Amino acid sequence: MTVTGAIWRDQLTADERAVLGRSDSGVAGATPDVLVVGGGIVGVATAFACADAGLGAVLLIETGRLGAGATGGAAGLLIPEPHQWSDPEPFVDLERASLERWRDLQRALPGGVGLVELDWLGLAPHDSGFAAHQPRDVEWLNPGQVAELVPGLARPMEGAFIRRQGRVNPLRAVARLAARLPAVVTGVAATSVTISGDRVVSVGTSSGAISPGVVVFATGRPPMLDGLPLHIPSERVKGHLLVTERTGIRLPGIVAPVATQIEDGRLLTGGTFDVGDETPAVQPDVIDAITAGVAAVLPRLRGLGVAYQWCCFRPRHPDSRPVIDKVPGLVNAWLTSGHFRTGILNAPATAAVLSRWMSQDVPPVDARSWSATRFGAP
């Protein structure tokens, strides 16, 4: 599904928008050392990491425009530390490492990737509103301290305050990375693979065959291609987000469960789980519920208009963790899928894992956590 209605494209420069539709040349007969299939943030970050590691000629192909799917509909929040309340340790370790890689990219690339550093404040009626496990790097605030940061709450709240988290405009990050890739072709769909023994020897596309040295599938959900014997359980989960009109109300970064302060005095909120809704349309009742929920916590926001509203489908595996693995039975094919709510956050670390695996034959730490076979036979 191509995401429409999100704010992110409107924030881009003309040059950044042009990169999202970049198409360098035809693909028929191409023989890249590395072929990356998928032009969301994970695919683009992987292609960038492979090129940066000197893995040879790297080609990325994408069915539509870069970032047109779940990437373009994401909130772009980079908040590993709050995940300590909900995610297993290997996942949190990956998230922390990935935020550091976002910071590295911001420093290393001319103009950066659009990383914005900001703090996270989680609200609760009392500290037992958080899990008994108390994460590191958390400042526990009493209701008076919370009220100083967020005046006008509907009721006294305690809070968990975490500094130095981040966010990006996901399309800007894609455009900044993709601008430095050696070869990108949009508007080309992978349709099939040809396997000889334990190797992919050809990837069929809507524009002809490609013969890669290695291939990485980063297509959101696991690839479903003729000739590729791969069956990993997954689903897509719809979610809604919105951005408000400009307001003089300022939040101290991300305030959960209220909103995130973004540019131009606007607030970003939402991130629903609309399980069972397979329609591509924005549902007005869901948008109304989001705005009502925000106003119930912070009444000052009641009546604030909605400037942007959109929905997207996020890929999810049964355990809500991604797959980062070799394609079972093949020595020159990798895949990553099911990043669900953390694809933007985890893209650079996932890319680093894959490029290191390809170049040094070193799988990730705790490989079982990311295995394609953890659900049974693929």
For each feature predicted by the language model, list its residue ranges.
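Extreme N-terminal leader/targeting segments of oxidoreductases
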Residues: 1-33, 52-53
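Short hydrophobic core segments
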Residues: 34-37, 61, 203, 210-222, ...
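Active-site substrate-recognition segment that forms the wall
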Residues: 48-52, 76-78, 112-116, 209-210, ...
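Glycine-rich FAD pyrophosphate-binding loop
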Residues: 51-72
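Dinucleotide-binding Rossmann-like beta1-alpha1 core, especially the glycine-rich loop
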Residues: 76-149, 293-295
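Helix-loop-beta segment of a Rossmann-like dinucleotide-binding subdomain
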Residues: 111-122, 137-178, 272-276, 331, ...
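Helical element adjacent to the flavin cofactor pocket in flavoenzyme catalytic cores
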Residues: 160-206, 210
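C-terminal catalytic lobe of FAD-dependent flavoproteins
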Residues: 304-378
